[in-house]
């Protein structure tokens, strides 16, 4: 195991020893291989550079108490990348190739995965890009699929803590656009709203990110920064927005299952109106990086709405977080198919 300060890692790039790379050419993928080269050499006309023909995923590997290593739902990431590839006229990365690449990268870099109990994980970044000679707006002649990894720490230093958010007039995605798939352009478009949200904070009340409303009516919550939103009602309902322009979060669907099957809640996907926040006693944003970010409050049109607390984590949010992370680290039995062991 590498000599790192495992208890104090942030969420930033740290170069590890190996990454996986595969090439698509003449209608088929090669076998792919591990490499120590962290630099890609691609043609200047590559569609990934000019026309945004690229997509990516994010998932984690976890060290369990017995020393074994878990991957959390990599098949779901593979399927989501396939849906994105279809939308951008890119070749699908077969699930077998995707999962094998992730397992090989984790196994080759297992010294970069921190000890059980440190909160550290190995973050994997699979990506697919269009490359090769090109100048016009059309699909690329060749493609690269690659997976690299970085050790990352617990997202919240000192424990789970709420963050505040503010709505933005900017749209994250358009109806029938690319909001429901994981393309880089969605994230580039979010950089300015994120910056503006942070600038509107004060020393007393900071805003972690922007909340995006539906692009058609600007009345319904869609995403919270780069994460999915959920709310907990007084009558034990777990409610999360449903829209074709929301990225289907694997973490969110895992929480929907846990809320219903493990916590006995009514789990609902539906409209969440920004002017009906009073129905929620707790709220959160969920995604791979933080798992759950408790939402302390939301500012909209100059009014600030507080949920359970600006400083304390709500009891249901805490139970959801503990259940999901317990599954990921192997302390709690997982639903069938959720865990893939790295042998």
From Swiss-Prot:
Q: Which reaction does it catalyse?
A: L-leucine + 2-oxoglutarate = 4-methyl-2-oxopentanoate + L-glutamate; L-isoleucine + 2-oxoglutarate = (S)-3-methyl-2-oxopentanoate + L-glutamate; L-valine + 2-oxoglutarate = 3-methyl-2-oxobutanoate + L-glutamate
- Pathway listed for it? Amino-acid biosynthesis; L-isoleucine biosynthesis; L-isoleucine from 2-oxobutanoate: step 4/4; Amino-acid biosynthesis; L-leucine biosynthesis; L-leucine from 3-methyl-2-oxobutanoate: step 4/4; Amino-acid biosynthesis; L-valine biosynthesis; L-valine from pyruvate: step 4/4
Q: What is this protein called?
A: Branched-chain-amino-acid aminotransferase
Instruction: Explain the purpose of this protein.
Output: Acts on leucine, isoleucine and valine.
Q: Which InterPro entries match?
A: Aminotrans_IV, Aminotrans_IV_CS, Aminotransferase-like, B_amino_transII, BCAT-like_C, BCAT-like_N, BCAT_family
Membrane-crossing ranges are none
The alphabetized list of GO BP terms reads: isoleucine biosynthetic process; L-leucine biosynthetic process; L-valine biosynthetic process
């Amino acid at each position: 195991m590498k000599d790192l300060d495992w208890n104090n890692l942030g969420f930033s790039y740290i170069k590890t020893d190996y990454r996986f790379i595969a090439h698509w050419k003449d209608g088929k993928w090669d076998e792919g291989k591990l490499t120590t080269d962290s630099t890609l050499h691609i043609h200047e006309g590559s569609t990934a550079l000019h026309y945004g023909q690229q997509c990516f995923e994010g998932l984690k590997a976890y060290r369990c108490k017995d020393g074994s290593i878990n991957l959390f739902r990599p098949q779901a990431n593979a399927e989501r990348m396939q849906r994105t590839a279809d939308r951008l006229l890119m070749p699908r990365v077969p699930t077998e190739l995707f999962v094998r690449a992730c397992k090989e990268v984790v196994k080759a870099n297992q010294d970069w995965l921190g000890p059980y109990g440190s909160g550290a994980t190995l973050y994997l970044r699979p990506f697919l890009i269009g490359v090769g000679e090109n100048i016009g707006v059309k699909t690329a002649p060749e493609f690269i699929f690659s997976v690299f990894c970085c050790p990352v720490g617990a997202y919240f230093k000192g424990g789970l803590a709420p963050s505040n958010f503010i709505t933005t007039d900017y749209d994250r995605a358009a109806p029938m656009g690319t909001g429901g798939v994981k393309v880089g352009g969605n994230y580039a478009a979010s950089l300015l709203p994120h910056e503006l949200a942070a600038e509107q904070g004060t020393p007393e009340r900071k805003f972690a990110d922007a909340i995006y409303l539906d692009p058609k009516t600007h009345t319904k919550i869609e995403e919270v920064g780069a994460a999915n939103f959920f709310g907990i009602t007084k009558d034990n309902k777990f409610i999360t927005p449903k829209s074709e322009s929301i990225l289907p979060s694997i973490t969110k669907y895992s929480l929907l299952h846990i809320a219903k099957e493990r916590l006995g809640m009514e789990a609902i996907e539906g409209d969440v109106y920004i002017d009906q926040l009073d129905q929620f006693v707790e709220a959160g944003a969920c995604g791979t990086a933080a798992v759950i970010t408790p939402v302390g409050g939301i500012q909209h049109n100059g009014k600030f709405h507080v949920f359970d607390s600006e400083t304390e984590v709500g009891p249901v949010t805490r139970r959801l977080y503990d259940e999901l992370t317990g599954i990921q680290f192997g302390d709690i039995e997982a639903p069938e198919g959720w865990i893939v062991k790295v042998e």
